[in-house]
Swiss-Prot record:
One of its GO terms (molecular function) is identical protein binding. Sequence repeats lie at residues 26-30, 51-55, 73-77, 78-82, 88-92, 93-97, 98-102, 110-114, 120-124, 130-134, 135-139, 140-144, 152-156, 162-166, 177-181, 187-191, 199-203, 209-213, 214-218, 233-237, 240-244, 251-255. Residues 26-255 are annotated as: 22 X 5 AA repeats of C-C-X(3). This is Keratin-associated protein 10-5. Pfam families: Keratin_B2_2 (PF13885). It comes from Homo sapiens. Keywords: Keratin, Repeat. GO terms for cellular component: cytosol; keratin filament. Interacts with hair keratins.
Amino acid sequence: MAACTMSVCSSACSDSWRVDDCPESCCEPPCGTAPCLTLVCTPVSCVSSPCCQAACEPSPCQSGCTSSCTPSCCQPACCASSPCQQACCVPVCCKPVCCLPTCSKDSSSCCQQSSCQPTCCASSSCQQSCCVPVCCKPVCCVPTCSEDSSSCCQHSSCQPTCCTSSPCQQSCYVPVCCKPVCCKPICCVPVCSGASTSCCQQSSCQPACCTTSCCRPSSSVSLLCRPICRPACCLPISSCCAPASSYQASCCRPASCVSLLCRPACSPLAC
């Protein structure tokens, strides 16, 4: 006959009950409706008892059986906030979501080991001391240079001036191999002819990105930043002007600060 206590015995037991003649149903009530097995009625094998497999809510059933079994609630998700990480739980290596490697395949050297400190990544719910160091690369520091002009990029040390609106520019970052954005002004695109590419100059993100002779000034009223009237627009018209080898200045309309068509001033009828 199993032992029992008054806390779990049914009303069938009188006040003058003894351990030897207590009904067996008093000591083994259903686990779902009973308060919980006490130290007297706790089974020897805690794993086989449903009371020791409680849900993730704090349960009084986990008082005397933590040494012989591991509750199922102690296996929470990796990075989800779980209310069941008590002392009976085995430490789990919780890897933050934000600390996943994002380096490109061909530039693995740009990665740096992170210690998953709170300042490393933003908005992470799992930055505990059990984190394994991973390669944490800022999102904003990816190369965006064109394929044919890789020299226009400058190496940056991921300082606040490197990229804008980055969630990963904290103090835990040691300078890494961070290829900056290829800063190419919209209005300073090469306008050289196809035969004279040598007049163009690569841009290094400075205001003076092109040579004066190569890059025409942009119109102050143009929103498209197109160059002002190129000399190619002032070709002579053979029926009224000089030969193609040398044309007269009066045959071409002067460059206009508001004209984007750059048509010649003269026409066959005008000459």
